[in-house]
From Swiss-Prot:
<dbReference type="InterPro" id="IPR000884">
    <property type="entry name" value="TSP1_rpt"/>
</dbReference>
<feature type="repeat" description="34">
    <location>
        <begin position="266"/>
        <end position="269"/>
    </location>
</feature>
<feature type="propeptide" description="Removed in mature form">
    <location>
        <begin position="420"/>
        <end position="442"/>
    </location>
</feature>
<feature type="repeat" description="22">
    <location>
        <begin position="218"/>
        <end position="221"/>
    </location>
</feature>
<feature type="repeat" description="29">
    <location>
        <begin position="246"/>
        <end position="249"/>
    </location>
</feature>
<feature type="signal peptide">
    <location>
        <begin position="1"/>
        <end position="18"/>
    </location>
</feature>
<feature type="repeat" description="20">
    <location>
        <begin position="210"/>
        <end position="213"/>
    </location>
</feature>
<feature type="repeat" description="33">
    <location>
        <begin position="262"/>
        <end position="265"/>
    </location>
</feature>
<feature type="repeat" description="19">
    <location>
        <begin position="206"/>
        <end position="209"/>
    </location>
</feature>
<keyword id="KW-0677">Repeat</keyword>
<feature type="repeat" description="43">
    <location>
        <begin position="302"/>
        <end position="305"/>
    </location>
</feature>
<feature type="repeat" description="17">
    <location>
        <begin position="198"/>
        <end position="201"/>
    </location>
</feature>
<feature type="repeat" description="40">
    <location>
        <begin position="290"/>
        <end position="293"/>
    </location>
</feature>
<feature type="repeat" description="15">
    <location>
        <begin position="190"/>
        <end position="193"/>
    </location>
</feature>
<feature type="repeat" description="4">
    <location>
        <begin position="146"/>
        <end position="149"/>
    </location>
</feature>
<feature type="repeat" description="8">
    <location>
        <begin position="162"/>
        <end position="165"/>
    </location>
</feature>
<feature type="repeat" description="24">
    <location>
        <begin position="226"/>
        <end position="229"/>
    </location>
</feature>
Amino acid sequence: MMRKLAILSVSSFLFVEALFQEYQCYGSSSNTRVLNELNYDNAGTNLYNELEMNYYGKQENWYSLKKNSRSLGENDDGDNDNGNNNNGNNNNGDNGREGKDEDKRDGNNEDNEKLRKPKHKKLKQPGDGNPDPNANPNVDPNANPNVDPNANPNANPNANPNANPNANPNANPNANPNANPNANPNANPNANPNANPNANPNANPNANPNVDPNANPNANPNANPNANPNANPNANPNANPNANPNANPNANPNANPNANPNANPNANPNANPNANPNANPNANPNANPNANPNANPNANPNANPNANPNANPNANPNKNNQGNGQGHNMPNDPNRNVDENANANNAVKNNNNEEPSDKHIEQYLKKIQNSLSTEWSPCSVTCGNGIQVRIKPGSADKPKDQLDYENDIEKKICKMEKCSSVFNVVNSSIGLIMVLSFLFLN
């Protein structure tokens, strides 16, 4: 099957190629026949001549070239004809062909004459003997023959006939045309030639004739026109040139001239205006900010300065009022010493629960300064008495590095009950045992 298809395709290809070659040959022979008819037929020759005439008629330059070549050819033919006639060597066949050529040339010449453009005469300029018909008939016979050819044609007809014969020939060509007609004829001949061109035209006619010749030439052009006419003539020559331009105009005229130059710039602006003017200058700067505001105003001013600072805070407040009390509170109670010893031991035990010192508070504030907020901080200790701090709500917008220890920070005491180290060890052990047992059981 494949062999049959191959044979069929090859045979089809050969058949188509044979037809194509035959078509090519037929086309070539047909074109050759048409060209032969155009070249050798009389009608084709006439058509060629007409095309040639039309072509050269449109192209004038080529037409002239063709005409010249034909003229040369005609002259050559005439010379040859004369020579042949004189020699008697021309035959009838040649004469007949030459007669036909002459007819063709005559016909071509007539056509060429029709296509030739007529020549136009050029305009000629009038000679010296023909005067200008538009010339001025009233020319001045005495006119200056040396008139400036570049003179102004629009000269002023109203020029001054009595011009100054001694006028400055080098006058300023840029002079002011609107000069003052009432100018001073007796002007100062020694006037300053470099006067200020921008001088004030409305100068003060009553100006001071005794002006200081050493006045400052660089005076402030923006000086205050409303300056105080009653200014102090004896002003301080050493006044501060950097004085505050926004100084308080309502300042106290009776201010203390000996005020403290090192006063606290961060002083409380809301200080008590009714404060005691005779306050103790040596008061404790670290006083307890949480002191009882309702302290007894009748307290003993001569209290014992050596009192026990570690007294039992849980002591019975009514013990001294039970002069004839019952039980262990009786004045002659034999167990009284036992109770006092127990109280002393309790006082020793409570040493771990005493309130934190100011130093401890300051250290804690430095430690948590970046985390300070209006919320209470964690307790400063994990066992015993500590402190909690926060920023007062009114000072929440202040930068943390500008917070005042006394006025911007609020403090309170906190207590941590679980202080036994044994308890911590037991808790840790129980937790470890629970973790290990959980791991092993699983």
